[in-house]
Amino acid sequence: MTRKSFALISLACSFVTCKAQQEVCFSIEGNPFEQEDAFSEFTHYIDVLGCFHVLAESGVSDSKLLHVAAVAAELLDQDEDGQVDDPSIEEALSTGQALMPILNFEGSDAEEMLFESYNGSGIAAVLYNEEIDPEQPGHWGADATVEEVLHTINHVGHAMVYPEAFSLEPNSSLLSEAMDVARGGQFMSVPDAYPEEAWYHYDDWTCDYECMAIEYLYWGI
């Protein structure tokens, strides 16, 4: 399987909050979902291009919230005209209620309530306060924003809109086929050891097959 199996996305991110050609400026609002148990502990919010929600709990700075929103906007609107580049992805994200939660720390009240009460399909990743650094956008070990936002867009968007290419289940897509080759076989969970011919060795024991596929797509991009 060649790299042509992937629809690669260019990540030329400028990480600004207002775009040049047709301005897209973010306003930080109160939590519009506070009546829902899953989101009751979050305090501030940004709507990105009408199809991607970013929610943060108390203690997360406005600058970090704006940074996450800006990354999402750049990934969705790379020509910076104020419109999502792929209308089908926009519709899928909107219908699926794509949402990125920003949590203060692992085990916070917001995390506990979210994990206990959420039963939707629009959350594919979370970000923690310490994982966000607007001064080092995308820097490995300092800022995980690009990775986690992209996971959400891929999971809620691309996997739904283009299943022949990006479906995450075993034997379902070009992506799953390519990953099986890269791992040296089809493994539903992390093997004790990868075959010698494998070149994708992701080893998070909490990651199931679909999780591995999302991670593989990220590394492919």
How would you name each of these model-derived features?
Residues 45, 89-94, 207-211:
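A general structural signal for short secondary-structure junctions and capping/turn motifs
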Residues 173-221:
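Metalloprotease/metallohydrolase-associated module, dominated by Zn2+-dependent proteases
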Residues 13, 58, 62-66, 208, ...:
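Generic detection of long, well-ordered alpha-helical segments
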Residues 21-46:
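N-terminal low-complexity, Pro/Thr/Ser-rich intrinsically disordered segments
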Residues 1-21:
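Bacterial Sec-dependent N-terminal signal peptides
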Residues 49-189:
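Acidic/His-rich structured neighborhood in mature extracellular/periplasmic domains
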